[in-house]
């Protein structure tokens, strides 16, 4: 049934280990703001607050996949129309023209799980935004993990909140951590008196302390720690900020521990391989009684429900680090409360250019404010650490492009901005590639849309721009990379993607 409200009574369940489940939904308040650590029952609480059709937004592909599975598992028998929206803006970049295909499907579903980029059209009046708004008005919009967005995306999310509020949506914001300045702005837009504001008491927060922090100058300093952890059959997670670093470290691990179960996971895999790796990570590594090592990038920060014993990580912005730490000692049971596990943080690089994709100053400040020497990271102090690193939110002015300014729509009805300002703002220059084999064998051309998606490797256009690669005119217009540049264990190696590495032995028809 289109436009049917879902039956979400399942989420009224209560459990002592999930303090948020013990708090009742205040029906007199239209909106919600929940600030609580991972594992406190945030998802259940946000859904419990909904009264109509639900749009559940999360920042990353991996997280929307995981959330979709979870809701399907929880509500499968009660709700017939739960939909997953993959990246809606399939950008076709060719002849320097950027076109945006807004996929207007899955209209009127009871529950949709998606990324906020897919709703951003309403802040910018990109083609198709009227029907998106029509679908959204009067619904419940959950904006979860809101702390993980970049500055620009935060500005866009604020604008979206303003528009959604204007069209009668109930807005439910969930976050583990958030700079106070940003929280204040959100509450101002929604109107404090309209918001059920929920955070845990210091007493309860103390039960969420789970990590002891150690600092190190370089990865090599931690090799003895790694050795000991492997001997003790620990599950080890190593997190890097860049794919190339992760690939280098994975090679070291392969040399050092040829017999230990290990995996590399990052964004530059064929989507089919990435899905397989995510499943293995959850179903095999996560439950392994023996030593295993997973080397990853930011893809593990959010919503991959894994719980390891020890982490070695490069310094990231403090809010992202707190997310990362959530993958260690995550499972809360009566036994694990009060038991702590170690996290080792590697100092940020000296050179600013090596700090990319992050701001060097933010990295240095984040490293500085964290404890050291095995000291406990206290949940009650996280807010002050974050405020030290981000004393104020930098306001980005997106009103120039926005369609909705000061409570008024700026566009004439059904007229849209011809070129999406959003793409330039978000610097979404994501394109896909496929391997030479998937091209030459005709596999990609003959495949249907779903099969094609599984062959595609997402990359940034800027990293392929000068490589003179062949580009197909079908599907997502993928670039073709040499077979030698890809392996199902390591993903895409950008250093080998030049056209000079094409295999010329494929039969020329």
List PLM regions with ranges.
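C-terminal helicase lobe and adjacent C-terminal extensions/tails of nucleic-acid helicase motors
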Residues: 183, 231, 248-283, 313-509
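Conserved strand-helix element at the start of the C-terminal RecA-like helicase core
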Residues: 53-64, 229-254, 264
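Walker A/P-loop
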Residues: 28-49
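Interdomain hinge/linker at the junction between the two RecA-like core domains of SF2 helicases
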Residues: 180-230
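Post-DEXD/H (motif II) to motif III coupling segment of the RecA-like Helicase ATP-binding lobe
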Residues: 131-140, 146-202
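Conserved helicase motor
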Residues: 84-95, 243-244, 263-278, 297-301
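Inter-Walker segment of RecA-like/P-loop motor cores
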Residues: 79-125
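Conserved Walker A/P-loop ATP-binding site and its immediately adjacent core
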Residues: 51-74, 86-89, 180-183
